[in-house]
């Protein structure tokens, strides 16, 4: 049987503060992953992690979503839905840091959009 090489999963991180920098480092260390890049509204954070991990820096969420198959959402909790929904609408699968969001309504919205786009959403407990 012939061994087929699967393409690497194109990963990104939205929010590279304290926890997000660890997501970037871990993706960068996994053979099955290609850390494509990072986005953070704080330019200093995104440039620091981009330089440390040797990946691209994206100036907005839309650019990150276009480049990735999977994105870790590591923004402040009250922004999780605001960050996650557009990424899923771009076809990304997500790892969202705990907690998923701040309300039942936001959770229902995330679930609805995930189903519509056949996006996998996992809540991370790093």
Where are these regions (language model features)?
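N-terminal Rossmann-like dinucleotide-binding module
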Residues: 1-52
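Glycine- and other small-residue-rich loops at beta-strand/loop junctions that grip anionic moieties
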Residues: 16, 73, 99, 124-125
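Rossmann-fold dehydrogenase core element
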Residues: 109-126
